[in-house]
Amino acid sequence: MKIGIFPITTYSQLDDFIPRVVWYLYPFRDWFSICNLYVSFKVKKKNKCLEHFDQIIYRNFKHMNISYVSNSNIFDFSFLFGLDYIFLTNDLMFRELSIFKKKYNLSIEIIRIDHERLSYADSFFLRFGEKIPNLYEKYKQISKNKILSLIKPLKTNKIYLFGTGPNSKYAFDYDYSDGLVIACNSMVINKDIIVKLKPKIFVIADPIFHAGPSSYAAEFRQNLIEMFIVNPCVIVVPLRDYHIYSTYLPSFMIDFLVPIFFKIPSIDESPFYIDILKYFEVKTTNNILTLFQLPLAASLGNEIYIIGCDGRPKSKDSYFWSHNDKVQIINKMDVIKVVHKGFFQIKYNEYYDKHMYFIKNLVKTIEKHGKQIINLTPSYIPPLQKRISDLILETNRQKNICDLSIILPIYNMQKYIEKYLNFLLNMQDINYELIVIDDFSEDLSLELLLKQELQNVDRLKVYQNFNKNGLYGAIKTG
């Protein structure tokens, strides 16, 4: 197989792309006869080691047979005649390259890896494994075998699905020993919570936060290893990323990896696969809950409980949503935004709307098959709001040691919260507690309440509505 990476026009671009090429292609190094980097200058110095990449990349570089090929005229595409694949680093040239390919009837495939302009450049890099002769079919057979040997024996009645939303904080003291816990994503960082929950399945799927070349992803993978040591369990990954994890994770984890296939491209209206044990694949969606957790739960159990899938108000569209700091890697967010600039240029409300569409339809599909879905923590997501239970809230009840409990429902009151709370919290000569219930405010009410709670831990308790949204539900929660 002969591949090229084009164009590289500056030293800084070379230093930026070399780590990506090594990270994604190192697992396939034995399949390449040629791996050329087409540079428009003469390379006279060593590459810089950049801190925001996983440092194992630079140790593996010496094992890659990469050649620098001078190409001073970046619009001279004649080198394409000798290649099978070209990895395009500048998507502005995609049209010109495609015209040249068509003109000369070339069979070469263009793989678009411009991480500054494309949101899914890294997914295209990851999916290159599907091009390797026979490897793709081998991985699908591994997937089928492991689903049957590792996933199928875990069938039980109750399944608990954990997300990483802020409201997951209400749920960590509950006893889940009567069912199977499926945890996900950055929950790996909190070993105390992992030991408490004892998940039997851990699911990960993100192309940049989990399978990418950044130091953020490196920290995630190190935590994944540490999590596995204290809690050995099945780890479900996309078949797309299986070569990454089977190459870079320790050998003692490989037998526990279960790759599951999802088809790309996929239309939103295509059906859900809610029996993985029969179909050995899932529908492509944009979130771990709908991609892996709910399909696994529907395949293994009858009662499905959801925790920590908070969603967000539509008005707060500067990011996907908020996370519980206890289960989130927060010290390297700036790093991953540098390494994957294009990924963060997505329109977050469009992503959110699609997520709502997938949840609504997947929940309906699962329930049509006789399964029950119960949401155990407050959520802005309408299908989860409708299925809320206060089962978790019961475990938060304490013997009343106050003479008076004041229940205060709140909705979009950011202008008045400080004034009202100061009045209520400064009352004298009475033993009381103040319980404030946020009814899914779309302004900054909840953030202000949580800040006040930290300053008044003995007297103020803040919850979101554990019932259907509305005044009655908020009062009932209190």
Question: Each predicted region: which residue ranges?
Answer:
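Active-site beta-to-alpha loop of glycosyltransferases that engages the nucleotide-sugar donor
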Residues: 11-13, 408-419, 440
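Metal-ion/cofactor- or nucleotide/acyl-coenzyme-handling active-site neighborhoods
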Residues: 2-399
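Short helix-capping segments at alpha-helix termini
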Residues: 428-430, 454-459
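Glycine-rich, basic loop-to-helix element that forms the pyrophosphate-binding segment
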Residues: 465-478
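Cell-envelope/extracellular polymer assembly enzymes that use nucleotide-activated donors
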Residues: 402-405, 433
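A conserved acidic beta->alpha catalytic loop
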Residues: 438-447
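Short, well-formed alpha-helical segments that are part of the catalytic scaffolds
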Residues: 20-21, 413-426
